[in-house]
């Protein structure tokens, strides 16, 4: 089945251009046409005072949005004379002052507009709405402006997380936005002294930036949010399907390096960063564009330069930083692999077994920003008999989720369809993820479950040196799964520690080739033909690789006893064992009757 084997060149992506882009002026916002168009429309239509943006909400991201708005909309505009000026008159020191208000006449007035656009890294009632201070041992009053006063007539940028943590701030802010009036809230002492502060007109626009989860939570507290606000998304990933898009993203990368770190990138570094970020997006045509994330990578790579005067980042420097990041985070991964290598968790990578196969899982721990793949032994036992069922042991013991259960049912339906079995199965089977003590979910093991079920029914051994991942439908077609890079590398790591023998490998869905961005050790092993990757489009191809037999009869092929198709072999086994069971049943009935006589 060499036609189904992947060549080493296909295991990691590279850009199609061979020279660095000449134009390195692309910015983050050049990669966000939907977002910038939405902001244009929001400002032009003036229908809603609020714009909700799905995006990263770190302060650096809010600041980046602030800078974009300033440069794009207010670059040539001085701050308008907008707002008010509060005047205090206090003829008698024993009385509270009389406070009068007039329109601001200059930007120096105490409640005049200070900014066109402003974001906040910290929110409190005082920082947002200002405060009224009564000086100690005195009846003097001081008014401190808040953010909303400083940006009166402009745009305020806040994160959804900030508002969720103090939702009462949002309720007051929404009231101000709707009424376009700001009323001072006085403490009890000042209220008793009948200190009156005139309310002021306040018109501003608000941008709320938040993650999808935070915005969903926000909407639960404010169900009519999207009746009050426009909505747009800051794309976390950029399309790079064609060469022009690739060069645009590479130009953006070079621009970040030059402006943020005063360094340069060579083509090898751009390709290595592309490979790194493809692992996150799991799509060679989608790549992360987060400035914060990319700058972190560039800073880390720059720390591995040979001398302090070297300001060109290459692939080797990026790779060193990547390996250092993995080393910092992979302690739990190494502990897991040690358990397998010490046979505390039994995973066989050599020989053959009937009804046993190595599936592949992605392991994630809460609070750990790192996931990894590891093999999982899936076993199957069958018993021939009418009215049988396939028992998912993990699901029955509430150790598997609904999607896993769905995958198991699809595997059963697929097998019944291939074998043309009656609705009442002529056999019983039990499938289990061996030595699995935590909850599992997902349908990426459904191809492996079908294969192990076929092995048990046909009584043919499966090679333990080949692991399998893939989801199937009822017709046996193999579909995409996630985490394919981690899964391949996890099985490879175990095989490598035990010694590569040139026969080990992984079967993956053909449709996930676009996800592949494997580490250099796997690529080198595939290049040396010490490790293999097979791509399959349907279950029949996977079973041909594993069992060296066709799943069903092929019209142009001659069959003998040693190469009979699997469906014939399974039906023959079921028939023979059913006859044997029937004969045994008759014998036991005769024996029972003799004893009674």
Write out the residue ranges for each language-model feature.
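Peripheral, non-AAA+ core regions of ATP-driven protein-machinery
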Residues: 1-20, 37-42, 145, 160-167, ...
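Short regulatory helix/loop adjacent to the ATP-binding pocket of P-loop NTPases
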Residues: 214-228, 519-525
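The structured alpha-helical core of multi-pass membrane proteins
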Residues: 380-382
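Conserved P-loop NTPase motor cores
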Residues: 212, 229, 234-238, 436, ...
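Conserved ASCE/P-loop NTPase catalytic core
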Residues: 1-219, 232-242, 251-267, 271-376, ...
């Amino acid at each position: 089945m060499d036609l189904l084997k992947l060549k080493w060149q296909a295991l990691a992506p590279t850009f199609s251009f061979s020279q660095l882009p000449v134009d390195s002026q692309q910015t983050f916002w050049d990669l966000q046409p939907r977002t910038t168009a939405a902001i244009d429309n929001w400002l032009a239509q003036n229908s809603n005072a609020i714009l909700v943006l799905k995006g990263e909400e770190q302060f650096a991201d809010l600041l980046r949005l602030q800078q974009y708005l300033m440069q794009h909309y207010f670059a040539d505009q001085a701050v308008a004379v907008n707002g008010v000026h509060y005047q205090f008159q206090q003829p008698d020191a024993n009385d509270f002052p009389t406070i009068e208000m007039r329109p601001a006449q200059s930007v120096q007035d105490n409640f005049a507009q200070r900014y066109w656009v402003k974001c906040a890294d910290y929110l409190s009632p005082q920082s947002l709405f200002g405060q009224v201070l009564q000086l100690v041992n005195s009846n003097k009053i001081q008014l401190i402006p808040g953010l909303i006063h400083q940006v009166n007539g402009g745009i305020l940028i806040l994160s959804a997380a900030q508002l969720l943590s103090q939702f009462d701030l949002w309720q007051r802010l929404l009231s101000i936005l709707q009424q376009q009036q700001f009323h001072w809230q006085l403490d009890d002492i000042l209220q008793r002294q009948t200190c009156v502060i005139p309310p002021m007109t306040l018109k501003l626009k608000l941008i709320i930036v938040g993650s999808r989860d935070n915005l969903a939570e926000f909407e639960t507290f404010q169900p009519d949010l999207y009746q009050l606000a426009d909505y747009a998304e800051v794309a976390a990933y950029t399309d790079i399907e064609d060469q022009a898009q690739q060069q645009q993203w590479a130009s953006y990368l070079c621009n970040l390096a030059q402006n943020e770190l005063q360094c340069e990138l060579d083509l090898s570094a751009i390709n290595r960063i592309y490979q790194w970020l493809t692992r996150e997006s799991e799509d060679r045509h989608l790549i992360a564009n987060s400035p914060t994330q990319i700058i972190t990578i560039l800073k880390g790579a720059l720390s591995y330069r040979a001398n302090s005067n070297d300001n060109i980042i290459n692939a080797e420097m990026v790779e060193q930083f990547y390996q250092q990041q993995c080393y910092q985070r992979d302690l739990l991964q190494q502990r897991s692999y040690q358990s397998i290598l010490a046979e505390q968790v039994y995973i066989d990578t050599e020989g053959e077994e009937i009804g046993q196969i190595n599936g592949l899982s992605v392991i994630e721990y809460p609070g750990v920003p790192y996931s990894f793949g590891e093999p999982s032994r899936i076993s199957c036992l069958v018993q021939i008999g009418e009215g049988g069922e396939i028992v998912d042991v993990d699901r029955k013991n509430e150790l598997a989720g609904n999607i896993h259960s769905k995958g198991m049912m699809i595997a059963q339906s697929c097998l019944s369809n291939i074998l043309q079995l009656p609705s009442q199965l002529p056999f019983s089977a039990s499938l289990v993820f061996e030595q699995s003590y935590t909850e599992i979910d997902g349908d990426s093991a459904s191809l492996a479950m079908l294969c192990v079920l076929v092995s048990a029914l046909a009584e043919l051994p499966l090679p333990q040196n080949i692991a399998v991942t893939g989801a199937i439908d009822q017709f046996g077609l193999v579909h995409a799964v996630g985490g394919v890079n981690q899964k391949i590398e996890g099985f490879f790591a175990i095989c490598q520690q035990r010694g590569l023998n040139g026969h080990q490998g992984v079967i993956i869905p053909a449709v996930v080739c676009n996800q592949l961005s494997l580490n250099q050790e796997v690529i080198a092993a595939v290049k040396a033909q010490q490790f293999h990757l097979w791509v399959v489009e349907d279950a029949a191809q996977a079973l041909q690789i594993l069992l060296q037999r066709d799943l069903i009869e092929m019209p142009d092929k001659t069959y003998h006893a040693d190469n009979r198709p699997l469906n014939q072999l399974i039906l023959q086994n079921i028939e023979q064992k059913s006859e044997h069971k029937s004969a045994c049943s008759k014998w036991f009935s005769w024996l029972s009757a003799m004893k009674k006589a």
